[in-house]
Amino acid sequence: MAIIRVTVRTFQNLEHAELFLSIGASTKDGLNKASLDAKFTISQSTSQPNQVVSVWEYKDKDHMNEVRKFLSAQSRLPNSLAPKEIAYETKVIHSS
């Protein structure tokens, strides 16, 4: 059963959000090199530009854990950025 995970990160300022976005630019290549197939979208709020929304789709719980473990190991995000983070996890009921 597919899983959708939405994470809303609110950074202290626009520069921190843009740093996160620039680091995230290499995410797809890293996942491909690790042979991890995951669908994701990373977007920036137009009304609150220091806010970044990530939407990930995983095949199942094991796949989610594997991808998240890889991303955590690859993270170059300084702890000093420490965004406020809210995450939502759902199971997919209908999809097209």
Whereabouts are the PLM-identified features?
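Active-site-flanking beta-strand signature of metal-NTP-handling nucleotidyl enzymes
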Residues: 4-10, 53
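Short, low-order "capping/linker" segments at domain edges
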Residues: 92-96
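An amphipathic, aromatic/His-enriched active-site/gating alpha helix that lines ligand/cofactor pockets
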Residues: 25-39, 47, 57-91
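A short, glycine/Asx- and small/polar-enriched loop/turn
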Residues: 48-52
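Short, surface-exposed ligand-recognition loops at beta-strand->loop->(often short) alpha-helix junctions
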Residues: 10-23
